[in-house]
């Protein structure tokens, strides 16, 4: 069996490689996907990904496995970065990591390697199960690290080629394995944030592409102007961090795109923003469209929290979702991801909040 392993230089993908080798497989080649964009590099002034490449080389040398660097900068910009910029311009909250997996890691990469490999291994926290000749995407044992949310838009064809060796482990167990076998990156911290940014701060990326535009920050309850911001695209509804005003904490309650106004409040559960019903479109199912939607739960962001809900399919590409509890951070552009027990069934893009 020929196996391709995607290595990022992090602990997770390195332990995934070790576990596949430990199972007795030897016909293995590793790949590092180069997806950062030249403009961002020149803007920051250095190459924050060189450390990744150094670790990839060290890991492959340790296990005597060949590796190759594949450049997907152009594809990534066209298929993921441009989408992110457009969503921010429209005042939405993008989820670029969903499309990074669908269009690049398991899209452009699969096209590049064609049918050279029987299996592609990564360090994602998720599980694949075969049932009645169908491949199911399941949540990982570690519900905090579970990444099924970001894998929700993969196809049957993509999932059929994948294996996630970390799906049955807790993050603490992965760290312990790394220490036990003395991996070169055993003490390396986990990466945070969007996959293509590396050490570039998210706000620096936004500023580079969309610039700055001064606008008022208004307290929702009083209507008073209490500050100035640099552009609505730097803020997400429900956001708490990054609001640099005294007498906090403050929460972003609403955005007026036309007037470039950010409304904030001390009250996290401000009724205007606590919603439970919304419309989604661009619906994607990993397998066939379900015949009924009973006992479904959804996530509206990455994390442990799931909501019980009622789903009403209006057309094949339009659905109304009613949560059993209100949520103060629902925002157009986010993705609602469908679950039944621990199976991830797919997802859809939120585009209109109803009530």
From Swiss-Prot:
SUPFAM superfamilies per the UniProt record, alphabetical: Adenine nucleotide alpha hydrolases-like (SSF52402)
E.C. code: 2.8.1.13
HAMAP family the UniProt entry points to: tRNA_thiouridyl_MnmA
Active site feature: 100, 195
Disulfide bridge positions per record: 100-195
Matches recorded under Pfam families: tRNA_Me_trans, tRNA_Me_trans_C, tRNA_Me_trans_M
Protein keywords: ATP-binding, Cytoplasm, Disulfide bond, Nucleotide-binding, RNA-binding, Transferase, tRNA processing, tRNA-binding
One MF annotation (Gene Ontology) recorded for this entry: ATP binding
GO cellular component, one term: cytoplasm
CDD domains, per the entry: MnmA_TRMU-like (cd01998)
Function recorded in the entry: Catalyzes the 2-thiolation of uridine at the wobble position (U34) of tRNA, leading to the formation of s(2)U34.
GO biological processes: tRNA modification
This protein's record includes keyword Iron: no
Protein name per its UniProtKB record: tRNA-specific 2-thiouridylase MnmA
Binding site for ATP: 6-13, 33, 123
Gene3D superfamilies given in the database record: Adenine nucleotide alpha hydrolases-like domains (2.30.30.280), HUPs (3.40.50.620), Translation factors (2.40.30.10)
Similarity-based family: Belongs to the MnmA/TRMU family.
Catalytic activity: S-sulfanyl-L-cysteinyl-[protein] + uridine(34) in tRNA + AH2 + ATP = 2-thiouridine(34) in tRNA + L-cysteinyl-[protein] + A + AMP + diphosphate + H(+)
Subcellular location: Cytoplasm
Gene that produces this protein: mnmA
Keyword tRNA-binding recorded: yes
Location of the region described as Interaction with tRNA in the Swiss-Prot/TrEMBL record: 145-147
Site (Interaction with tRNA): residue numbering on this chain: 124, 334
UniProt-listed InterPro entries: MnmA-like, MnmA-like_C, MnmA-like_central, MnmA-like_central_sf, Rossmann-like_a/b/a_fold, tRNA_2-thiouridylase_MnmA
Native source species: Borreliella burgdorferi (strain ZS7) (Borrelia burgdorferi)
Chief place of localization: cytoplasm
